[in-house]
């Protein structure tokens, strides 16, 4: 299980490097889907199966709509891929940066321990992630509304950024 979670963490870092190099909206959306999938795999590896499923469905339902709009509006005739020289340079720079930061923190990672959500499941009636969902809806209602507002604002920002010099995404048909 440790090897599987380590593989998921490596996939998460590679997915985020793929997003940060940002060759074209098509490939950046693919990198985000990979990063979200393996990030939810990390959560499943630590016992948060319900939380990871909810986060993945929210991501696929909400943010991919924004990337579908931006990919449709930024239709490039020849999009840059990860094999191009400029994009490959960014990938190398980000990978070297991740390796340097990991080397900086390498010595102290074993002093703290990661524990699963249900570490003492024999003594508990509730699961940790499902009771957290109930707490989010009871006391976190204001934050939930604020997050929905920020997602709507993000949609409008992406639509405004991809309009270019023309009238943009909000033009009359």
Curated annotation (Swiss-Prot):
It catalyses: a ubiquinone + NADH + 5 H(+)(in) = a ubiquinol + NAD(+) + 4 H(+)(out). It comes from the Eukaryota. This is NADH-ubiquinone oxidoreductase chain 6. Its main location: mitochondrion. It is a multi-pass membrane protein. Keywords: Electron transport, Membrane, Mitochondrion, NAD, Respiratory chain, Translocase, Transmembrane, Transmembrane helix, Transport, Ubiquinone. The chain crosses the membrane at residues 1-21, 24-44, 53-73, 87-107, 141-161. The keyword Transmembrane applies. Core subunit of the mitochondrial membrane respiratory chain NADH dehydrogenase (Complex I) that is believed to belong to the minimal assembly required for catalysis. Complex I functions in the transfer of electrons from NADH to the respiratory chain. The immediate electron acceptor for the enzyme is believed to be ubiquinone. Pfam families: Oxidored_q3 (PF00499). InterPro entries: ComplexI_Subunit6, NADH_UbQ/plastoQ_OxRdtase_su6, Nuo/plastoQ_OxRdtase_6_NuoJ. The gene is MT-ND6. Its EC number is 7.1.1.2. Belongs to the complex I subunit 6 family. GO terms for molecular function: NADH dehydrogenase (ubiquinone) activity. It comes from Oncorhynchus mykiss (Rainbow trout). It is found in: Mitochondrion membrane. One of its GO terms (cellular component) is mitochondrial membrane. The lineage of its organism: Eukaryota, Metazoa, Chordata, Craniata, Vertebrata.
């Amino acid at each position: 299980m440790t090897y599987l979670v380590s593989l998921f963490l490596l996939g998460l870092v590679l997915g985020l490097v793929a997003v940060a190099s940002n060759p074209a909206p098509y490939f950046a959306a693919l990198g985000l889907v990979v990063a979200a999938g393996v990030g939810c795999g990390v959560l499943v590896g630590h016992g948060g199966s319900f939380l990871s499923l909810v986060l993945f469905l929210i991501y696929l339902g909400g943010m991919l709509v924004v990337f579908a709009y931006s990919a449709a509006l930024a239709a490039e005739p020849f999009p840059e891929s990860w094999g191009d020289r400029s994009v490959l340079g960014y990938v190398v720079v980000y990978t070297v940066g991740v390796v340097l930061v990991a080397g900086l923190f390498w010595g102290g990672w074993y002093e703290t321990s990661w524990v699963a959500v249900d570490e003492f499941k024999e003594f508990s009636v509730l699961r940790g992630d499902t009771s957290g969902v109930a707490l989010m809806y009871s006391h976190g209602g204001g934050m939930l509304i604020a997050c929905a507002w920020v997602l709507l604002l993000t949609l409008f920002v992406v639509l405004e950024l991809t309009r270019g010099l023309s009238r943009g995404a909000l033009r009359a048909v």
